[in-house]
Amino acid sequence: MFQRILLAALVLSAAPGVRAQAAAPPDMPATASLRADTLVLTYEGRPIFRGVVQSGGARVDVRMLADTVNDAVTQVIKFTASGGRVRVSGDVTASTQAFACEVDPAQDVVPMVRTASGPDANLLNRAVYDRARDWVISVDFPAHVVVLPKAGADSTTFSLDAEGGEVAIRFRPRFYEMHRGLRAFHPWTYTAWRPSVAGWSSWYAFFDSVTGRDVEHTADVLSRVLKPFGYTYLQIDDGYQRTPVGPPANWLDANAKFPSGLGVVARDIAARGLQPAIWTNVAFHDSAYALAHPDEFVRDTAGAPAWGNWIGFVMDGANAATMRDLVVPVYDSLRRMGWTYFKVDALRHLRYEGYNSNADYFRARGLRRDSVYRSVVQTIRDVIGHASFLLACWGIRPELAGVVDAVRVGDDGFGYGGFAEYNSFNNVVWRNDPDHIQIASADAYRATTLTSLTGSLLMLTDRPDVYLTDRAEAAKRAAPVLFTLPGQIYDVNPSRSSRIGEAAVTLSGAGPRPFDADKRPAASLYLLDVNRPFEHWSVLARIGDDTPRIRFSTLGLPADRSYLVYEFWTQHLLGAFRERFSPGAIDPRFQVQDFCIREALAHPQLVSTNRHVSCGGVDLHDVQWAADTLRGESDLVAGDDYVLVVHEPSGFRFVRAEATGAAVMSSAVRGGVRRVRLRSAGGGRVGWRIVYRGLPHGLPQGQPMGQPPSHFASQ
């Protein structure tokens, strides 16, 4: 008989039913009660889990532990069945910012970075993380668990079904802040930037030799060639300012290479339908001004303005006059000119060579260095507003969580390491910037594919005429960038993020620090789950040959069904497989494989489109099968051939393809799939239909288009 135990209730400070979004959540366990076989966890006065505990008559021992280690609170409720199995099934209720995920790395698994677009039903998920309140509830290994999202209005509900000889429910409040050590992460005060950020930067194209004419030509090419595909930002990165940098006039009154002035440049960029983006930094190299206004700068032991490598004279962020005279005028004027994207450079040097290297100055004044540092960037944010995009550069900046929209996670030049070393930060803490991509380089397809599938910041940096060549395909098929959430709230390779606390005691920013993201890839598999109301599918990018066979269960897919596997870049259908598939060799032209994986159905079905590396994630709005017809709606780019890749099982005869708002240019079978090519002169939303004749006996009409698992036994 089930042993009923009432767990001790812990009184919360928040009033029942009140959930003040601006207030910090309590750093304490939930109230836990077990009555009549029903377990309820209540946090901030609201139930976050309500479930039933079943054991089939076996005696169940219940234990609870709530403890604090290194300021991080953990609460565990463990159910152990004596000679049988125990099952805990119920609902997790959280905010609309909650998502299903993994919170702890599994043992002996292939390293793989997971992301999701839309509510995720991946069978690897063992937890629900509520970003708005920074808590996570999970089930410990080795219990078998399925976490599935449900639709909700003002909250998000997930079903949680766990079974085993032992089931342990674990609750961790203030997870990123305390358990991950991000003390500045207060997500109840801000939301992550959701729109796609894709565009062009002048740095590797022109370095500091960029001219106004270069920007004008690039704007022309970008607006005609890449803007229709989602590249909307044009960023001037250095080269426009006068020297020495520091005084506002030298930032705002451009040098002779920009004779029309920054205001005109911004208007010209915007007139082409692009977002004007600009680079600045927080260095100060005007010695005459610094010596004339020493109170506006951090001072050394002799009382003179302190100097540091890269940063020059160190602006004192605790001095209101410094902010008023040197910082606010720059960003207020640029905002008024029309600039909407601000990259702020040299922030690592302000922290390391500036504030950390002059710790005694702040200590003597009773000031926290990190607070003063954060206030500098907060001032910039307050001036430009939250409608403008703010990028911190460069290196990991834990002090700026909640102030900036994105962080350039590594050194100059595109880096792969951050995709796996800071995967849990992306679009939760900030958006990761791996730095600019040169599509003229050999790894262009690999770089754009991974950047897009992980939901990272995507900026190109080539001479614009490169985009008039076929190399532009690597860029066109990667934008816009989907808003994704991490499938893991741990880092796949924790070697960097585990040392993030060292930022507080670092004195030099000359080169990457041990906690900055690496340039080398830290994983070879990158999985994106695309979840739409009409269909669920997976996209797997592979960049290494260390996985000659891939099991579908490794990808979190049910192992009891067949899947179609199609490679996007080579346009090759590998076939239909059960349990596993062999990806084969990576084509050296692309240096990446981009597999579209959909559950194989008994009727004609869409396998992919050619529009985007997400295999339809940005362009498909509906796909249905009914009355011997495959129909859907897609967003087309004007003048760009749009290809529907359709798998046709035996027993169906193609009749015709038709479209509303686009012309059907061709329809042909090649490589085991039908390719229906559409073209629209004006672009936009298009309806299409592919009609068949003949239906296998017994196949029901209106069969779902590959839905996520819906019950516990589906794995």
Can you say where each PLM-predicted feature lies in the sequence?
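Carbohydrate-interacting/catalytic domains
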Residues: 20-21, 32-33, 82-83, 117-123, ...
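Carbohydrate-recognition beta-sandwich/jelly-roll modules
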Residues: 25-232, 256, 341
